[in-house]
Curated annotation (Swiss-Prot):
Domain of life: Bacteria
Protein known as: tRNA modification GTPase MnmE
Gene Ontology CC: one annotated term: cytosol
GO MF term set: GTP binding; GTPase activity; metal ion binding
Gene Ontology process terms (BP): tRNA methylation; tRNA wobble uridine modification
Gene: mnmE
Sites where the protein binds (6S)-5-formyl-5,6,7,8-tetrahydrofolate: 28, 90, 129, 464
Cofactor note: Binds 1 potassium ion per subunit.
Keywords: Cytoplasm, GTP-binding, Hydrolase, Magnesium, Metal-binding, Nucleotide-binding, Potassium, tRNA processing
EC number in record: 3.6.-.-
PROSITE patterns cross-referenced by the UniProt entry: G_TRME
Amino acids binding Mg(2+): 240, 261
Residues covered by the TrmE-type G domain: 226-385
Compartments where located: Cytoplasm
Amino acid sequence: MATMVPTEFDTIAAISTPPGEGAISIVRLSGEDAVKIANKVFKGKNLEKVPTHTINYGHIVNPKTNEELDEVMVSVMLAPRTFTREDVIEINCHGGIVPTNQILQLLLSNGARLAEPGEFTKRAFLHGRIDLTQAESVMDLIRAKTDRSMKVALNQLDGNLSHLIRNLRQDILDVLAQVEVNIDYPEYDDVETLTTKMLREKAIEVKKSIQQLLTTAKQGKVLREGLATAIVGRPNVGKSSLLNHLLHEDKAIVTDIAGTTRDVIEEYVNVRGVPLKLIDTAGIRETEDKVERIGVERSRKAIEQADLVMLVLNASEELTDEDKELIQATSGKKRIVILNKTDLPQKLNMDEVRELVPEDELITTSVLKKTGVDKLEEKIAELFFGGIENSQSTIMVTNARHIALLNQAEDSLDAVLQGLDSGMPVDLCQIDMTNAWDELGEITGDSYQDELLTQLFSQFCLGK
């Protein structure tokens, strides 16, 4: 279904700031009657007569009782130069649950409707202010875990990904139009050969662009969702100390008693621009303790699901069978092997370790003395962003929906090429080319289903 701007919208209202105590809260209105409704409850200048994009001092009052609720500043922004392209009012009131909710309820009782999650952004999309990739980047920006992920989200919000996708769609549309002309009005005997050549070249060209975009998907997913990182090792080798160092706070219990971490602890941390979802696992060993055994089993699952494994070994002890089992169990994963406790007399046989672990995976540290941890952080950044240090200026694919649609478009282009290779008539190959055009259009929202909008914007917070 193509994008259509609805002819009528009611006026919506919501609190746009997080709930709780704070210096200031913002209550937002959007719609044809936004100014009229706000004016009913505002004591100060007549908001229906003030210039657009002005901030106006006054009080919110209950029109029925004339009771003052709060001293406020009201921003008046008239269509179309607003986020939603509707008239927008933003009431800056004192923070706190009670005054903010009282103002919201007053607006609702005077003609506004409580906005659904993401409805302001949805209206911006439906009015053509932004496309779907830009709408999704709004939430990415809110949820950004590092400076780098924030810059990538801003890049997408600026429309850089949209521009690239639309250029690819235009390339497809141009060749489809030319193919149609050649089929309907052939002027040369070899028109079929020329048309086939044209279709093939464009399918290859667009497919190559899609493949280049998909090469950024892995790093993009890391920036958007965080890198699932399991910290593993046998009990009491320093896993929890490492977690606490990376977090810069004590989240895990650190003692000299083996087996004190009996569950899986998850935390997000920014390491040199890489958002890590750190998982501190219970030490893996044979145990009779029922609770600890459950933690050990969860640890094994965490290793399977992790994008990166940090395997911690104790450099002050000899390599044990449990260490060797963990080295073997994690050998197929992207891995950093950390030789910890180097501040103590070393008993670890390095020749034995190097036989089992490649040299470039090894890092020596003393988390207690804070030595070697900088090299660990450098290693993490090098592993995942060595080739894209300037990722903030790169068009990246960070969204699973976009990745799926790009893969579908690539499959459609493969079908075009396979059809041409097998001698299929050009007009039938056009169908798959058109499918690729549609699938790319779903990324930007140039074509969409209503169910998609409902599902997508329901993930937003109220007031956005």
